[in-house]
A protein has these predicted regions:
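Conserved beta-strand/loop scaffold segments within soluble protein domains that form the structured core
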Residues: 1-240, 244-247, 261, 268-287
Length: 287
């Protein structure tokens, strides 16, 4: 707490449904100033809210260090959608921890766009404590130049019949490298829990690197869980097929990349934010 430098406290009372998204903008324009915001969201029973934030720093700001924390507490029957886009400059280092705790029949949705130009690490974790609680996490990131990134998404099941789904998509170009981790943990007693995860890395350069690491830790017998992971170059057969339909190679590759990222981009709850994310993807890919 001693390192807090602002943030957001969002409290949603019991049975309150907030239709319009709550938006926040975090702008860093001083490399010497502490940049450690803390986001705290509490959604009481049967409430609902959508929260969206943007993290931005100017190109002339210098070597910004961001160390942020987001905590989300979702009470019984409540629902929280949390969308976040990070776009810090090339000299910035971004470290972000996100945590959610869901009670009985509660739901949390994570929608994360990691569009930083500098190195970053993020850890997004949901503790499904309540029976019938749900977590859905979708993360995309695009790496360029010699950027280094580490993206971890977790779901820990305590509640019976709890459900988690994690999808991470990463596109790497130039000499960028990514480590993508997905961790599903089902504790003893979480009978009939279900945990699914998918991590995929698409590389646009022979010098780009990507590791996809799915991990299932199961301490209960009566559960279902699955994972899928892939790392590879743009499919040449797909490019050839699209070019045979009249597209240029650049247009074909762009279409494949958008299709690769679409499961996350299409889930952004605000149209303008979705459009902003598409612009940032295009800018980072140099298209």
């Amino acid at each position: 707490a001693a390192l807090w430098s602002g943030g957001v406290f969002l409290y949603v009372p019991k049975n309150v449904i907030i239709e319009d998204p709550i938006q926040a903008l975090f702008l860093s324009d001083d490399a010497e100033a502490l940049f450690a915001p803390h986001i705290l969201i509490v959604a009481e029973e049967n409430s609902s809210v959508t929260y969206v934030d943007n993290y931005v720093s100017g190109q002339d700001t210098g070597a910004v260090m961001h160390n942020g924390i987001a905590e989300v507490f979702v009470k019984r029957g409540a629902s929280v959608r949390f969308a976040s886009i990070h776009h810090l400059n090339e000299q910035a280092t971004d470290i972000t921890f996100r945590r959610a705790v869901t009670e009985q029949d509660a739901r949390v949705e994570w929608m994360i766009g990691e569009m930083n130009l500098g190195d970053f690490a993020s850890d997004t974790n949901t503790l499904l404590k309540g029976d019938g609680s749900t977590s859905d996490a979708k993360v995309i990131c695009v790496g360029t130049n010699k950027q280094r990134m580490n993206v971890t998404t977790r779901a820990t099941h305590f509640g019976k019949s709890s459900d988690s789904n994690m999808i991470t998509r990463a596109v790497m170009r130039d000499e960028a490298s990514a480590i993508i981790n997905g961790i599903t943990k089902i504790e003893r007693g979480a009978t009939h829990a279900n945990g699914e995860q998918t991590e995929r890395v698409l590389m646009l350069s022979p010098k780009a690197r990507g590791d996809a690491n799915p991990l299932l830790l199961i301490d209960e017998d009566e559960v279902t869980a699955g994972h899928a992971a892939s790392v590879g170059q743009v499919n040449k057969d797909q490019v050839y097929y699209l070019m045979s339909r009249g597209l240029t190679q650049e247009q074909a590759e762009r279409l494949i990349i958008y299709g690769f990222l679409a499961p996350v981009v299409s889930m952004i709850p605000i149209k303008k934010v979705e459009e902003q994310l598409k612009i940032l993807v295009e800018r980072k890919l140099g298209q």
